[in-house]
Amino acid sequence: MSMKVTRDVVYVTHDSLSEGIGMSQIVPLLIGYAGKGLKVGVISCEKVDAPLELRETLSQNGIYWKPIKFGRYGPLGGFGRVIRLALFLPKAKVFHCRGDISATATSIRSKKPFIWDVRGLWLDQKIILSGLERRVIVIRIAKLLEKRAASKAKAVTTLTSAVYPVLRRRHPTLTTNHTVIPTCVDLTKFSFSPKLPQKRKLLLSGVFNDYYDLDRTREFVSLLKKDLSIFITWCHGKEALRDKLGVGEDEKKVLTQPEMPKEIANSSFGLAICKGDSGESLLGVMPTKVAEFLAIGRPVVVSAGIGDLDSMLMEHGAGVILSNNLEDDIKQLVNLLSDPQTAYRCRELAELYFSMDMAVNKYHQILRDIGLDFN
């Protein structure tokens, strides 16, 4: 099928489908849309040639894929992606736009309604990750992207409830058609494993960019090793930019997304410690790795203030929120690892909030809410 065919929904993203986020978050959602009987398309920015296996998976589910080149990094690269996404945008009755760049590109090319799928405060995160605070012109352009996305969106989804008031403060005319849909996982692939391994094992999962606090992670791991006999593995995809974390890991593995469920099941718990000076950007964050650990039945250790995680983990007894007293935090962790009910509480939390099937249903309802009927 060509770009001239008008599909029910086209998913627009500047992320790569073949990398971790694409494989864990986007592809399952697309397949879920197709399972609803929708004619589905997707346009994405790829850093390497599209893998044949992924092409076949999408094709077998009746999903049209238009991969375009990711291009260069940096602000100029981002501008180029806006132009290319707009230029090659497939036709659709409605669009699902992942992030500011995708929403802006869609609004430039099409007048059809779209969901602005806010995956966090993008500009705020880029300032932290790329040091943009001194690049005034770049910041102004990025703010214009966010403003345009907010003004044109017919519906907005966020990973957390905590970030929506921030968006409303910045953009008073933002639609009130808002739904919280956290980072989700396929609960069938990330199946429940009730028994924690006898040997204590910490799995550091995924790419640890500058958003994560490796100094505090190192401090926590150092204290942990004094109290527990523990083996630490860092596991990531091919896209990782660093050779080592340097936080006390005993081994490193490079695995694909389909290999991750087994690796998590063989671990005792996960960890996600973000920098405390990340400002409002933390309010919009919901790390994929956290959802994956909870789905399999593994508790997580996280820093305070990450999206809605504080209340979720505390209410369900599914993890530890780091405090100023790391020794007490470690005691809480030991208690969780010794409690045979911990795995069940983690899975229950995942089923309540992080189910991909639930996300598909919510997104599908939003498409109906903005005036489309696929019957």
Language model region names:
Residues T13-G20, G32, K36-G77, V163, ...:
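N-terminal strand-loop element at the rim of the active site
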Residues Q25-I26, G32, D186-K189, K201-K244, ...:
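Conserved catalytic-core segment of nucleotide-activated headgroup transferases in glycan assembly
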Residues T13-P28, D49-A50, C97, N209-Y212, ...:
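A short, glycine/small-residue-rich beta-strand->loop->alpha-helix junction that serves as a flexible
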Residues A162, C184:
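Carbohydrate-associated surface elements
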Residues H14, F70-Y73, I115-K147, P165, ...:
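Acceptor-binding helix/loop patch of EC 2.4 sugar-transfer enzymes
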Residues N324-L326, L337-D369:
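A charged, aromatic-enriched C-terminal amphipathic alpha-helix characteristic of glycosyltransferases
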Residues I31, I83-P90, T104-A105, W116, ...:
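Membrane-proximal helix-turn-helix segments that form the acceptor-binding/catalytic region
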Residues G20, S24, Y212, Q257-A265, ...:
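Nucleotide-sugar-dependent
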